[in-house]
Amino acid sequence: PAKLPDEQDLRAVLAYNMRLFRVNKGWSQEELARQCGLDRTYVSAVERKRWNIALSNIEKMAAALGVAAYQLLLPPQERLKLMTNSADTRQMPSESGI
């Protein structure tokens, strides 16, 4: 996915993240649907922001993709901030000097 979604549009964030994690696994929409026990047209509609999605289906998709459910709803901009902060923390010595 090229264009980052609006952080306030959770359906866009979910669609972006689903596609990102799915493509990173090398999966088609059909394969993700099979892994989740859902229909391919449902996965396609969610990725196109056509349908709202039940939390139980977010959990199924997250489990199939090997991520925590919250990661599907985390704006990519926030994920980058967390990764940057985590890297900064690892590089800085602790306050105790250890």
Regions found by a protein language model. Give the residues of each.
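A short, Lys/Arg-rich alpha-helix, primarily the initiator
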Residues: 1-24
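Short basic helix-loop element that most often maps to the first helix and adjoining turn
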Residues: 16-35, 60, 87-88
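DNA major-groove recognition helix of helix-turn-helix
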Residues: 47, 57, 76
